[in-house]
Amino acid sequence: MTRMRSGGDSTRLLDDEQRARKSCREQACREELVERLARAIHEDGTTEPLKGLFLRRVSSPTGPEHGLSIPAFCIIAQGSKELYLGEKYYRYDPEHYLLATAELPIVVQIREASRERPHLSLRLDLEPSIVGSVMVESGLPSPRGRTSAPAMDVSTLDIDLAEAMLRLVRLVESPAEAQMLMPLVTREIVYRLLVSTQGDRLRHIAAFGGATNRIARAVKRLRADYDKPLRIESLARELGMSVSGFHIQFKAVTSMSPLQFQKQIRLQEARRLMFGEDLDATTAGRRVGYDDASYFSREYKSLFGTPPMRDVQRLRAAATASVEL
């Protein structure tokens, strides 16, 4: 006698079938993404085949790389990446994505990569104007409240977002189609990010009056005036914030204090001056605001692990690549 399936059995069977189909889609998407990135970038390094879309290949582990984040959506096709922002630690892989919403000093490291299985990743830069436009067209509300949001976080990469990014990568091989379709696919990606778990964070970069936007303006000012004395009272007043409120909101967004932020920007610029413009340590230190050469050397060693000129010699010997999210 044939046993009739109950409603519960049918529902479970349907759920199992849907999960299986989703798993197949995810696997196919990851495999195609790896194939296309490997085809698009043959040697180690970073390339920008389409405006705002960066592809990166790394065939050996890297040491800690210091650099600056920018507002961007970042995914990994193969491998994983570790990232430090102040006291915060992040790790992401093919099942997760990283969303950054401000320009901040970061440290990035790739621990596993080989010629047989290189690290493959991509980054899509995000324009606040496009985020704002998509919010308006889709009727999405402004960020909830006026509190600040962390400038960086990692979330699970869902299949719809992954497939949208894959469609963008496909356009690399079709320049004629890219001219017409890239703006549309980019807006789809922005929309999917806006309605994701990180959507509220992303909305902050388009909200002029929000606390996160005000901190972003402070970050921009500190980066531009890194060699000048830090005047917190004046900056907070300019942003319409109390000094204590500014400190609290700044650390909530950047994971560091304004003074720590300025120090990292100064030291990274000094490193660039010594490595790129062949300045000596004393001159580079003075250029970025350090009048005391000994103090500059101590601060530099504290951040980069070695004294200034020894660090630059190591960089030149290793021909270190620029940091990428």
Region locations from a protein language model:
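N-terminal regulatory/effector-sensing and dimerization cores
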Residues: G45-S142
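Residue at a beta-strand N-cap/secondary-structure junction
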Residues: E82, P229, D278-L279
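Intrinsically disordered, low-complexity and often Lys/Arg-enriched segments
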Residues: M1-L14, A321-L325
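Amphipathic alpha-helical segments enriched in hydrophobic/aromatic residues interleaved with Lys/Arg
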Residues: G7, R12-E32, V131-E188, R192-L193, ...
